[in-house]
Amino acid sequence: MRACLLALLIACGGGTATTSSSGSAAADLDTSGLGKSHATPVPATPDAAVAAGSAAPPAPAPPTTAGYSFRDEAQLLYKIAACGGPESERIPESMGDAILRDKLTKVANRHCTNVLKREAEFRAAYFEKHHAWFAETIPKTIPKTVVYPFGGGDLLSALVAFPDATEITTISLELAGDPRRIKTLDPARLGNSLAALRVEIGGLLSVGSNTSVNLSAQQRNDIPGQVASHLMGLVTAGYEVTDMKYFRLDDAGNVVYIEQADIEDADKKKMKSLKGDWASPTFSEAFSHVEIRYRKPGEPSERVFRHFGWNLDDTNLTKQPQLLAHLAAKGKVTMLTKGASYLLHRPTFSKIRNYMLEHLAWMLSDSTGIPPLYAEPAGMIQETYGSYSGAFLEGSRGTRADRSFVDLWRKNPRRKLGFRFGYVDASGAGHLVVTRPK
């Protein structure tokens, strides 16, 4: 039982780790509160996804005029893999004749019967039942730009906490993935790919967790696992996708959109994973980083989401500093970290930790966030919720960083937390910490 629980909850954290993988953070969203079950709700209207934040309309995202658009592929993945939109529009006429479309529809509908139920249960827990905690705890004046290190596949958690965000960035070892195959999959391959996807998203739509095995496997699926996971977040939160492009960073950290010629050139080269013991991707380097534009139905302005496939340990950030330059240019931002394998506790992740301490205006995390060992000397205040007796992962328990968190909870006032949002502690208790400048 203990081994199974550990496998379910271990997240991957964007660097090199030994006891856990180094990719994305597990979302660890407990849709059962702390052990309580919910009935499947009626799908929420778009407004039901709005929790905390300013009532002012979001600032318009700058238009994109360059780069190859994968809008059509994004729309297909949104409908087929993430199960957004009407069932009658799931398989468009462009995917084949009536007989083929009927077969594809049956495959997609079987998948969506499972996924829509899980999305609805999640929505009931976090956008409805636990809505009040986020609305009351998160200030309305925080920046609308959100950076989520170690957050691969977990746009959903950022949408729960910060529904007014106009720009969200996640970073992890997982590469975004190639969306092109969704247009040509036959019913058998589509069924196999969707079945694999339901396994590979792990507990994203239940306990919000994943394992390194699943995250590695995503990179070999015909359906891009990272993109599909993010689109599930949009569907669950009541958003629609408007465009999707891929990009790279230049030496100064500026976004450069991938053109068709770049894709054709990259397709000739073999791609390696960002972690040595992971399966090699079945797609090219051109599909490492993705930008998805989205909005609520009827909303005039697009919002921007970007996922970076990037190793966040010090060695790699020294070799490839473009990401830090890109992030620093955003100025003060709102931050989120959870399920991050305690990598921010380690001395080998000092560069990303220092960036966070220098640029956070307000941060929400579980105990895998920035420990008081580093936050207090940087002039931060940390407010705790729930209870904490030590790290969930045994290999991170009892370290100086972990003990500083135990001491923080011991000296802080007791604040209740009626749900799980990230890792539990060594005793199975949910907990959260707010970090902000004094």
Which residue ranges define each predicted feature?
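General secretory precursor processing signal
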Residues: A7, G15-T16, P86, V115
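Non-globular targeting/processing and membrane-anchoring segments
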Residues: L29-G202, S284, K296-K438
